[in-house]
């Protein structure tokens, strides 16, 4: 713990806490201040001036990052018949029906994405208490309730991320790994920012993005100048 604290202090010394960095500077600093001994995840966090209690100010969706996330998602698909075969052919890791529901209810959660055909949602709905809090419940807004299961599986395997504003109006998302070239991280960052900017509710008032930070696993938060994106 003492060693970790020392490493964090050393990382913080490289950051000017009063400054909001350009995206290029912030990405470079995130890589430089990372002290994890593994390929750390790089994340961004947007603090948005929205009221998520209002239906028209809820922000949720999905996108495929230009350079992926650096992680191959484990994809589970609820489908039957031809659609089940389509999911398997597209590379889904797990495909099933009631058997998967029983397995998940028994505590199995070794997957990252859940996709379902519309006709399976009555069955999947039984897992709401398990999947909902983990942000794994299939949803049409994120493209995970669909008849085009092949496309959904391929996108999930190819770097698709989902995002959702929490109760405080904060949206967090993975934009890659520390091992990524700085240019690729910056491009992923800019692509995600474009999506967030386009998602601004028409009824939102005042400054939309009140703060923006980038960080790595275990690393310090670095303020980003949203105007640089």
From Swiss-Prot:
GO terms for biological process, alphabetical: regulation of translation; translation
Key words of the record: Repressor, Ribonucleoprotein, Ribosomal protein, RNA-binding, rRNA-binding, Translation regulation, tRNA-binding
InterPro entries with a match to the protein in the record: Ribosom_uL1_bac-type, Ribosomal_uL1, Ribosomal_uL1-like, Ribosomal_uL1/biogenesis, Ribosomal_uL1_3-a/b-sand, Ribosomal_uL1_CS
Domain of life: Bacteria
SUPFAM superfamilies in the record: Ribosomal protein L1
Pfam family, one: Ribosomal_L1
Keyword Transmembrane: no
Xref: CDD domains: Ribosomal_L1
GO MF, any single term: tRNA binding
Gene Ontology CC: one annotated term: large ribosomal subunit
Biological function: Binds directly to 23S rRNA. The L1 stalk is quite mobile in the ribosome, and is involved in E site tRNA release.
HAMAP family membership: Ribosomal_uL1_B
Summary of subunit composition and partner proteins: Part of the 50S ribosomal subunit.
Stored PANTHER family: 54S RIBOSOMAL PROTEIN L1, MITOCHONDRIAL, LARGE RIBOSOMAL SUBUNIT PROTEIN UL1M
Family: Belongs to the universal ribosomal protein uL1 family.
Protein name: Large ribosomal subunit protein uL1
The organism of origin for this protein: Streptococcus gordonii (strain Challis / ATCC 35105 / BCRC 15272 / CH1 / DL1 / V288)
């Amino acid at each position: 713990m003492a060693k970790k604290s020392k490493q964090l202090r050393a990382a913080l010394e490289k950051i000017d806490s009063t400054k909001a960095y350009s995206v290029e500077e912030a990405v470079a600093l995130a890589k430089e201040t990372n002290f994890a001994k593994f390929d750390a995840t790089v994340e961004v966090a947007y603090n948005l001036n929205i009221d998520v209690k209002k239906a028209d100010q809820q922000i949720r969706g999905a996108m495929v990052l230009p350079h992926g996330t650096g992680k191959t998602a484990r994809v589970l698909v609820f489908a039957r018949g031809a659609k089940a075969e389509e999911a398997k052919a597209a590379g889904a890791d797990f495909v099933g029906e009631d058997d998967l529901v029983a397995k998940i209810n028994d505590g199995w959660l070794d997957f990252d994405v859940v996709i379902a055909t519309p006709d399976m949602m009555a069955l999947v709905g039984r897992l709401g208490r398990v999947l909902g809090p983990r942000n794994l419940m299939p949803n049409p807004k994120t493209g995970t309730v669909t008849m085009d299961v092949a496309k959904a599986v391929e996108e999930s395997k190819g770097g698709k991320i989902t995002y959702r504003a929490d109760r405080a109006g904060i949206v967090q998302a993975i934009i890659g790994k520390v091992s990524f070239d700085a240019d690729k991280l910056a491009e992923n960052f800019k692509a995600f920012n474009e999506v967030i900017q386009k998602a601004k509710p028409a009824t939102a008032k005042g400054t939309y993005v009140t703060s923006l930070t980038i960080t790595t696993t275990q690393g310090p938060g670095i303020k980003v100048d949203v105007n640089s994106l």
